[in-house]
From Swiss-Prot:
The lineage of its organism: Eukaryota, Viridiplantae, Streptophyta, Embryophyta, Tracheophyta. It is found in: Plastid, Chloroplast. Residues 1-51 form a transit peptide. It comes from Zea mays (Maize). InterPro entries: Glyco_hydro_1 (IPR001360), Glyco_hydro_1_AS (IPR018120), Glyco_hydro_1_N_CS (IPR033132), Glycoside_hydrolase_SF (IPR017853). This is 4-hydroxy-7-methoxy-3-oxo-3,4-dihydro-2H-1,4-benzoxazin-2-yl glucoside beta-D-glucosidase 2, chloroplastic. One of its GO terms (molecular function) is DIMBOA glucoside beta-D-glucosidase activity. GO terms for cellular component: chloroplast. Residues 17-43 are annotated as: Disordered.
Amino acid sequence: MAPLLAAAMNHAAHPVLRSHLGPNNESFSRHHLSSSPQSSKRRFNLSFTPRSARVGNQNGVQLLSPSEIPRRDWFPSDFIFGAATSAYQIEGAWNEDGKGESNWDHFCHNFPERIMDGSNADIGANSYHMYKTDVRLLKEMGMDAYRFSISWPRILPKGTVEGGINQDGIDYYKRLINLLLENGIEPYVTIFHWDVPQALEEKYGGFLDKTQKRIVNDYKNFAKVCFDNFGDKVKNWLTFNEPQTFTSFSYGTGVFAPGRCSPGLDCAIPTGNSLVEPYIAGHNILLAHAEAVDLYNKYYKGENGRIGLAFDVMGRVPYGTSFLDEQAKERSMDINLGWFLEPVVRGDYPFSMRSLARERLPFFSDKQQEKLVGSYNMLGINYYTSIFSKHIDISPKYSPVLNTDDAYASQETYGPDGKPIGPPMGNPWIYLYPEGLKDILMIMKNKYGNPPIYITENGIGDVDTKEKPLPMEAALNDYKRLDYIQRHISTLKESIDLGANVHGYFAWSLLDNFEWYAGYTERYGIVYVDRKNNYTRYMKESAKWLKEFNTAKKPSKKIITPA
């Protein structure tokens, strides 16, 4: 999860992009100390910090008092706590054991200047070779579940079943899934987390396929391979992760692979259309999602699984007290959440998007709408922070540049009083505002029928650059992250008490990893990865607290099964 990289756009004055610069116009993206690495057999450190050391003021962070710290027994025994990752960000082994090239492999290798530190995820966190270590960490922390994604080009190197199924890729995920289950950890699998087979990009433009058939069919076949090979043991599926982010950044701003944007904007391939292509890709994603869910319900229903998709949702607060700013907030939420949620709830895009994007927004056929409506029995919400929404007049003086400009609302980091919405949390775009999560869950309850929800990502990143290096000891003493996680878990309890239908929480991320266009300049993990010393893992204070949380006075474990 990451916001628009405004500096890369050279549009700092643009009203919708102002919020993505800090007060000094700095750019930003989205995620027991040992002096030497452990042996290769045990590359992580589980030394423990007493609970008493994690109260009061730590490194300038005022932590919750002991009575305020959330407890596991606040939640039902079948409520899931876990951690999340994605394939491209952590696996590495980019060209090993038959894996094909992904859009991100191609992007990072051909446009390294588009990554903040010029890096790539050829090795990532080396999890392809260290997955056993990662599962041991999850087990030690008492996690109920692990959310990870399956690399499409690792399973289908050429993107299609006709191009061949890579058995080595199948076997890798089977080993991972089996090991998780042997350790009492439930796998939550994301089928697509932004890594398109490069072969499909070159064949027909990937998700820009104008026929609305080839990418939908190829994705459906990929999903079928996943269901066939893993469905007997995987009971929780997410078809797509953050489609709004993927489409807007890949084809709007161009900061994500394949790096497309309109002429005149600053991206790798400025021959696209930032006002149209995100909507084409988004439409294809929704059609592919509907086909995959239809397939699952027809042929795999006996496996008693859950299936849905995960949305990235940034909370919105009106900039001022005017009715216009309140409406700006609503339009912003329509593009942020409603763009992909309303089609699966009621079969079409939000009214405000239809009114403002007009002919740029594709239409669904009656048959497509029939498959879309109700194509989920669970949904994921990825929440990091909130922002102010300020009205922009609809007039000839304002010309949208990006698809997200169709909200006619500027997204402001600072309110009318010059203050941000909450305390800054390390990387400049995240501010502590747990109330935003509660607001979103109440929207899901009151507007969208209160579906079963999982918080599938929640976390902060610590900046670690050449100009501002983060010492290992400081990274391990991540009290801001600890405080952030505790306050959001407490807010979850409040939301559930208000009737929110929430069933689980996943911290983002299990590991420090490759953070897309930010490269390795931000550390989102609850576990530190020492990339200079054999990718040794060390638990941060946040991970140690989660271990205490998960194991202290825990109700008898009961894995969630579908109703």
